[in-house]
Amino acid sequence: RFNKHNEDSPFQKIKKVLESGVGNSENSPQYIVQELQLNAMHYGVPQHRPRVFLLGIRKDIAEVKSLTATTDIWFSSNFFDGNIGSPLCPIPTIKEKDILSVYDAIGDLYDEENRNLKYLNILNKKSAFKKVIKHKKEELSNHNLRNHSDKIKKRFRLYQYFSEQGISTKVFNIASKYNATSDKVYYHEIEKALVNAKVPALSPDDMVIARDKNELIDTVLELATKKHSQRPLKAIEPSPTVVSIPDDVIHPTLARTMTVREQARFQSFPDYFEFKSKETTGGAMRKVDVPQYTQVGNAVPPLMAKVIAQHIKDLIS
């Protein structure tokens, strides 16, 4: 639940206010409130994005329609275990085995042989978003490829290789310690971390990272960094939660971070929705500018929002 240290969380406080009556009047409306944790990937969005919701129906309407709420929070994943919760719980729109992946979302942008356009057809044709979004451009907007130095690209390729080999990127942190101290203990830790690494080491775009173990260790030492939060996407899995800063997510096969359009695909924005403003900004400008990556990362996924809105409409109509 939402409580922490035996105190009500802000969500619980809001829930209690809604249930007891909003406002100071004796006639203030009361609500039947359902606590929810809904994951966007259960509603046709190719992204692991669990979020907490409070869905409330005015009590007098709920009583007429026999609508009730569960006493505990309902998770959208519960549905796959046969728990449908209460009438206020939005049922997932996709089977667990059919949860969409990174490749479903952006495969057409980097794989010429990709013919799986089902998700794109839903986004761009069947979603009905075109009824409310005006768009005249034919070319794909917001798809400017990110520029990186050769060293950063080399590090990205190593991240991709490590992900494929099941090697933790924390080895870079160990390498930083060795570079700073020359302590052989750290060198042996690197050797241990790479003991099962397959060589020659190749990146997904067929670049040779290292021809043998010694060269692989040298490459790790060359690219050492204390930052190991960056990770490549896995093409066969949903995207991790899209956030407003793009630096930590690496393309599954190319040596770069993601474009605004690719992140927007993960969020289920149709291709004809164009993001304005600068791509990124920083410092004091963040107070006045909302860059494109922030617009994408802070949004509720449109397909998920549509499901919830339709569910509420069905409840009260």
Describe these PLM feature segments.
Residues 1-214:
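Class I S-adenosyl-L-methionine
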Residues 122-317:
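C-terminal target-recognition/interaction regions appended to catalytic cores
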